[in-house]
Amino acid sequence: MAMTLLEDWCRGMDVNSQRALLVWGIPVNCDEAEIEETLQAAMPQVSYRMLGRMFWREENAKAALLELTGAVDYAAIPREMPGKGGVWKVLFKPPTSDAEFLERLHLFLAREGWTVQDVARVLGFQNPTPTPGPEMPAEMLNYILDNVIQPLVESIWYKRLTLFSGRDIPGPGEETFDPWLEHTNEVLEEWQVSDVEKRRRLMESLRGPAADVIRILKSNNPAITTAECLKALEQVFGSVESSRDAQIKFLNTYQNPGEKLSAYVIRLEPLLQKVVEKGAIDKDNVNQARLEQVIAGANHSGAIRRQLWLTGAGEGPAPNLFQLLVQIREEEAKEEEEEAEATLLQLGLEGHF
């Protein structure tokens, strides 16, 4: 998701995505000066300019796009940085060296029993030169770059899935089903390829019984989709939980001591969606069910809980997940400001100023 945002944003601003950084997790109330101060403290040796900021609805936070303006040491760019409101995340696409690219390209073609000359001949170019270089006709070179090299790059370089076999005791490097499925769903959103290619990459991650299940399904239905494969794996290897069990787990999940209410809501959401999938809660009632459980499960006795209770007691519809998080985070920000003011006042009374 983040990589898609980085690439689309760069495309819209005509910026090379390999010369850009995406920083997100920035609080909504953080202004440009605060963002710049945090960036400069975390990346003092990195030369950049800020191209823009936006509100990222899925993260309920701001994101910033930076363009790298000088020579870049990618090792000096942190993946995370401490900032206002917590940890800010950083994403970038470091360029691959020409030597590594050519090596992987030739290995890929060799596995398929092809050479660059074979590719050129199939594309209709007569008497191709032995190696791609400056003497290659511009028409041929451009065509190969656009129609062969770029698709090959997307096939050779992509984020791999973790391994899953479905065995009772996972082997080295293998995951149990639930963590594997969560990671797989995240990566599938990042891949900008056809469903056939997604299915091929999915098969790469499967071993043992899990691979056997998909091979059998594919032999019976060659057009089976990636989503159908994942659904089948979930039915075979996922946890068996009744609708009643899922509902009890949801209703008995409470806010932990020291946990922010917004974090509790996010932690509660997968449990709620599981209850909805099991049919214990109707989709039309999901917002009301979420609000009621947040009020019941919160151990916070301050203004936030009172505000939520008033929201639930009102005649209007219950807020959706995004609206609820915005409401809670606004109240959390107010409480943090009040606590900071109270601390400063106390320090003043004690003569620390």
Swiss-Prot record:
<dbReference type="InterPro" id="IPR048270">
    <property type="entry name" value="PNMA_C"/>
</dbReference>
<dbReference type="GO" id="GO:0005730">
    <property type="term" value="C:nucleolus"/>
</dbReference>
<dbReference type="GO" id="GO:0043065">
    <property type="term" value="P:positive regulation of apoptotic process"/>
</dbReference>
<dbReference type="Pfam" id="PF14893">
    <property type="entry name" value="PNMA"/>
</dbReference>
<dbReference type="Pfam" id="PF20846">
    <property type="entry name" value="PNMA_N"/>
</dbReference>
<dbReference type="GO" id="GO:0005737">
    <property type="term" value="C:cytoplasm"/>
</dbReference>
<dbReference type="GO" id="GO:0002437">
    <property type="term" value="P:inflammatory response to antigenic stimulus"/>
</dbReference>
<dbReference type="InterPro" id="IPR026523">
    <property type="entry name" value="PNMA"/>
</dbReference>
<keyword id="KW-0539">Nucleus</keyword>
<dbReference type="InterPro" id="IPR048271">
    <property type="entry name" value="PNMA_N"/>
</dbReference>
<protein>
    <recommendedName>
        <fullName>Paraneoplastic antigen Ma1</fullName>
    </recommendedName>
</protein>
<keyword id="KW-0825">Tumor antigen</keyword>
<comment type="similarity">
    <text>Belongs to the PNMA family.</text>
</comment>
